Amino acid sequence: GHSFSASVLPYEPKGNQHLKRPEICLGTDPVFTPDDLLAMANEYFTKAGLEVAVNTPFAGTVVPEPFYSLQDKRVQSLMIEVNRGLYMDERTGKKKETFEEVKYCLQRFLKVLFLQKK
């Protein structure tokens, strides 16, 4: 996963300037992100009370090159990007009181995902 700034940064595309930043951005790949994985993640984070967007403000995911080249559909990938405004004061870099809650939410998602994929 990654995190992103609560405000638009200078290097971002001009089209992002007007967009409201979601709390969670789910980055996908047309080959490696199956619909059921995306739906499950979207539902989980939405039910957790978080605002979710897909491929906004950032798109894509990471797949190791050997698998990407082969387009091996046994490999699944989803990028979970967290708005830093959820868990830290970006001006000072200090954790907010919500840090542990956000961390737990992400840990719980991974547990749910792992159990579902068994």
Residue map of PLM features:
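Catalytic cores of processing enzymes, dominated by hydrolases/peptidases
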Residues: 1-87
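His/Asp/Glu-rich mid-to-C-terminal helical/loop segments that flank catalytic regions of hydrolases
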Residues: 90-118
